């Protein structure tokens, strides 16, 4: 069996020069998957992509990702620890991105959207980037260019305990990536009741119900900025979405492993 998560054609289009080389690469990848007894896709959108566009013929089912994170026991204490470590005012609204600092994740979009939100009147906020990557210098230059040096905090790499506290401290998890298929970080955020804000057309948003346990908005910086401000203005609505994110989207690996084990036994028995 094999797992399906990466949008290979997109990777090959971005990194291979010649069409023949892209075809050879896709053919080689799909020969592997089509030789499997069963494939597991990380969400329904990826399953459809592989079956409709990539020519997957093997049996395929959706197997959702999960996390080993757990809800912080004391959110107020976690917030104080984060504020002290990163110099954040206790009354500041916090937004968070966790992952590779790479513009393929559309993190520059998030920064420009926040600059627009600041123009629209958003005050007293911090945008935390937790992670390392090849575009740290480019991101820092963009932050300076847009006048957000006070608002943007580069956290670097953190351990699991602090990462859970970062998710808990954040009001929103900003994830405008159009590249990711189904990221673990959105499940980690949901574990702490922190809803994610996605873009329309993002495959990684296919596991949420917009306005119920997460948010999806048009892929423009102005629309994203307005969405953030509208979400924060509707405190009752935000509380409902936050609770639903944890209830609907938080899934532990302990739960998933039981199902995976049963599937392994089923496949072994069939063969």
Where are these regions (language model features)?
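Membrane-proximal helix-turn-helix segments that form the acceptor-binding/catalytic region
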Residues: 22-39
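Conserved donor-binding/catalytic core segment of Leloir-type glycosyltransferases
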Residues: 40, 88-105, 111-114
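Carbohydrate-associated surface elements
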Residues: 45, 66
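Short alpha-helical donor nucleotide-sugar binding micro-motif in glycosyltransferases
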Residues: 157-158, 165-170
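Aromatic "clamp/platform" in nucleotide-sugar-dependent glycosyltransferases that forms part
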Residues: 178
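Short hydrophobic beta-strand element within catalytic cores of glycosyltransferases
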Residues: 195-199
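Conserved acidic donor-binding segment of nucleotide-sugar-dependent glycosyltransferases
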Residues: 210-211, 215-221, 230-235
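A short, well-ordered alpha-helix in the C-terminal region of glycosyltransferases
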Residues: 237-251
């Amino acid at each position: 069996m094999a797992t399906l998560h990466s949008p290979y054609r997109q990777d090959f289009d971005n990194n291979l020069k010649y069409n023949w080389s892209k075809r050879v690469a896709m053919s080689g990848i799909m020969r592997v998957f089509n030789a499997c007894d069963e494939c597991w896709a990380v969400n329904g959108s990826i399953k459809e992509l592989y079956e409709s566009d990539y020519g997957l013929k093997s049996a395929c089912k959706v197997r959702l990702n999960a996390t080993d994170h757990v809800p912080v026991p004391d959110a107020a204490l976690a917030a104080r620890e984060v504020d002290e470590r990163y110099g954040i005012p206790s009354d500041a609204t916090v937004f968070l991105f966790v992952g590779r600092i790479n513009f393929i994740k559309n993190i520059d979009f998030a920064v420009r959207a926040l600059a627009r939100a600041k123009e629209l009147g958003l005050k007293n906020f911090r945008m935390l980037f937790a992670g390392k990557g090849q575009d740290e210098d480019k991101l820092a230059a963009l932050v300076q260019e847009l006048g957000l040096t006070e608002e943007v905090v580069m956290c670097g790499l953190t351990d699991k305990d602090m990462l859970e506290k970062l998710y808990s401290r954040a009001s929103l998890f900003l994830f405008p990536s159009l590249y990711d298929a189904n990221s673990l970080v959105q499940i980690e955020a949901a574990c702490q009741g922190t809803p994610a804000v996605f873009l329309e057309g993002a495959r990684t948003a296919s596991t949420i119900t917009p306005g119920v346990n997460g948010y999806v908005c048009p892929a423009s910086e102005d629309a994203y900025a307005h969405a953030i401000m509208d979400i924060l203005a509707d405190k009752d609505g935000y509380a409902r979405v936050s609770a639903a994110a944890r209830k609907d989207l938080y899934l532990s690996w302990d739960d998933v492993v039981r199902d995976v084990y049963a599937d392994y036994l089923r496949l072994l028995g069939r063969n």
